């Protein structure tokens, strides 16, 4: 089963990061220490994900068990239409 989720807005990214953290029962402080941020900064970034650096995003995803993938939007639409 494919659990990928397309993201088109920064707020969606914040919601996804927060939900994945909570599913793994990790506190903001635990994730922040592994990513190299303060708990306050991580909390801020969950609400303002447009300010997350790529380096922070990759470390954050690794910490909470997510994988970042990029794909061609047109190819995904073609696959969806085939179903």
Segments (PLM) and residue ranges:
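A detector for short, charged/polar N-terminal pre-domain segments
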Residues: 1-12
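Short basic helix-loop element that most often maps to the first helix and adjoining turn
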Residues: 15-30, 59
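Short alpha-helical DNA-recognition segment
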Residues: 25-43
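DNA major-groove recognition helix of helix-turn-helix/homeodomain DNA-binding modules
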Residues: 55-71
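Short, charged recognition helix plus adjacent turn
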Residues: 69-83
């Amino acid at each position: 089963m494919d659990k990928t989720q397309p993201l088109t807005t920064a707020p969606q990214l914040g919601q996804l990061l927060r939900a994945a953290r909570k599913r793994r029962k990790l506190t903001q402080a635990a994730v922040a220490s592994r990513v190299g941020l303060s708990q306050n900064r991580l909390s801020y970034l969950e609400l303002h994900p447009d300010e997350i650096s790529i380096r922070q995003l990759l470390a954050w995803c690794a910490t909470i068990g997510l994988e970042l993938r990029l794909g061609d939007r047109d190819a995904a639409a073609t696959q969806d239409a085939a179903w």
